[in-house]
Amino acid sequence: MNIFEHDIQNLSQGNVVAILGSQWGDEGKGKIIDILSKHSDITCRFNGGANAGHTISVNDKKYALHLLPCGILYENNICVLGNGMVVHLKSLINEINSIGGNIIERLYLSDKSHILFDIHQTIDSIQENRKLKEGKQIGTTKRGIGPCYSTKVSRVGIRLGSLKNFEHFKNLYLKLIDNLMELYDIKDYNKEEELESFYKYHLLLKDRIIDVISFMNNRLNEKKNILIEGANAAMLDIDFGTYPYVTSSCTTVGGIFSGLGINHKKLNLTIGVVKSYLTRVGCGPFMTELNNEIGAYLREKGHEYGTTTKRPRRCGWLDIPMLLYVKCINSIDIINLTKLDVLSGLKEILLCVGYRSKGTGELLQKGCYPVDEDAPENYEPVYEQFQGWEEDISNCQTFEELPENAQKYVLAIEKYVDSPIVWIGVGPNRNNTITKK
């Protein structure tokens, strides 16, 4: 059976499937990634670093993953970290050790990905503190992601492939660290201790660092099932997101091809993951935000606290213009709607279906989205109102078992976005997922 028939238990050979966040992250991508990882041969990441996070439950044990793809939890799965990533090796080794077993034998790292050093994290904190004093805080995770991509783009960063020859790596390392210490006036930094750690990483990982481009394209020729796991989400994309309140990598579909080196024609299916309401961590415009008791209700019921930072997430109503904008960019084929159960108990639910200019009164054109920093000053959301439901829906197994008002809400989203909603999350566990025919 073909995956286009949406039977996740029966993937046909040679499928390349991408799972991408369609909002500001934290959509609940981990669950569907975990479900599909069991049926794939290779699971890949193509962007970001340890600023992403999934919490996956397998056999009643929870795993917090920030760098490793979810497929690492399944013995039949090969996992790949692509060249578009920035890798903090200490964090990676800690994740590997937390899972245990011989999982490193199933892990490959691109020789073209960049190494994220502790000094990048130090610089991240310095930059964020400066912006805070200026009232221009971005709200980064302070994991060093932006500074590492900065050294990459400035052509002074160090690729993971350099670690295979340790003496060569050592020379590059000392030059980079000395330059960054001088540039940011960092007085206290233990280079010797970090170099000792990197020698251990060299011994442990030298055979796992490969030419991922060749590896991936050979696997494609072998008709392997490949699952591509997006980190962060479309509205945090460095180009398409709400700049400057974005991450530093390409989080949209184009990042797959530049971050893994695979042919764009090989991608069979793009799954857009959409939370039933909207959340955001950190600063930046959020035009459907609920700074009231409803927002607090969603935060507590949905456990909306960051996997990586533990920061409380801002909550608001679902934004259809945002989804249409993201659909244009990512060419979403089907939707996984998550956390519908969190809306249970609300008397009414609002759905943002458009934006009206505060100046002219005109509606924003379909497919456009106001991503600029001053968007809330220029546009106001247009809402459609839906009646809520009181029932606990976590035990619903079919779409028809959902309360009528819940069905109406889901169908309205499907109508406005014009993409089929195939999976609906109605609870935190893997089996709390409805497949909508």
UniProtKB/Swiss-Prot annotation:
Record's keyword annotation contains Nucleus: no
UniProt KW keywords: Cytoplasm, GTP-binding, Ligase, Magnesium, Metal-binding, Nucleotide-binding, Purine biosynthesis
Subcellular location: Cytoplasm
Entry binding sites for Mg(2+): D26, G53
Enzyme kind, highest EC tier: ligase
Active site location: D26, H54
Extra information: Parasitic protozoa lack the de novo purine biosynthesis pathway and rely exclusively on the salvage pathway for their purine nucleotide requirements.
Family: Belongs to the adenylosuccinate synthetase family.
Name of the protein in question: Adenylosuccinate synthetase
Record organism: Plasmodium knowlesi (strain H)
